[in-house]
Regions:
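Accessory carbohydrate-recognition regions in carbohydrate-active enzymes
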Residues: 22-178
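Bacterial Sec-dependent N-terminal signal peptides
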Residues: 1-23
Length: 178
């Protein structure tokens, strides 16, 4: 019995002294491909899911008065890492398609005055968009988080196969609006 106990203790000690192995999902960086023409999004989705809840940093129309807008192509997945403001968080994105599509069901939390237009990237104060910093951005498989700095709203996103889930944490002394 003593030999079995010693073998068990040695195996247990060896197992406990092994470095903790990273989960495979810890090795994934969803930010890769979100700049330039990578056409990927940093938000949350589940494998084979029908929703991909993610931030949209701009909405450039394909054409204005019948004239094609080349910059629309940059926003195929709705997000460009180079941008410093967010227009909202939508539930449908394609990754790597090279064609602008989806971006449906856009939600944007805010405090203060209701604004109908998104404004421009050059002048975020001209609409409802909010500035953000990549320093507050967390993107990992199935989860996205960012702080909207204009209204100090913490946004957390996750997804199941059929549902996009948003959690907004507003400043305690501000009116909560969506």
């Amino acid at each position: 019995h003593m030999q079995k106990l010693m073998k068990s203790l040695i195996v247990a000690f060896a197992y406990m002294s092994m470095p903790i192995m990273a989960q495979k999902t810890d090795l994934v960086n969803p930010i890769i491909g979100t700049n330039g023409m990578g056409h990927t999004f940093p938000g949350a989705c589940a494998p084979f899911g029908i929703v991909q809840v993610s931030p949209d940093t701009d909405t450039i129309p394909h054409n204005i008065d019948g004239v094609y807008q080349p910059r629309a192509y940059e926003y195929c997945a709705g997000y460009q890492h180079k941008d410093s403001s967010i227009v909202g968080f939508s539930h449908t994105h394609f990754s790597g398609t090279g064609h602008s599509d989806l971006g449906d069901i856009l939600l944007m939390p805010f405090t203060g005055k209701l604004q109908i237009n998104p404004g421009t990237a050059d002048n975020p104060d001209s609409g409802y968009r909010s500035r953000f910093s990549h320093d507050t951005e967390i993107s990992r498989p199935g989860y996205y988080e960012v702080l909207l700095t204009d209204d100090q709203i913490k946004v957390q996103l996750t997804a199941t196969e059929r549902t996009g889930i948003h959690k907004y944490t507003y400043p305690a002394d501000q009116k909560k609006q969506l």
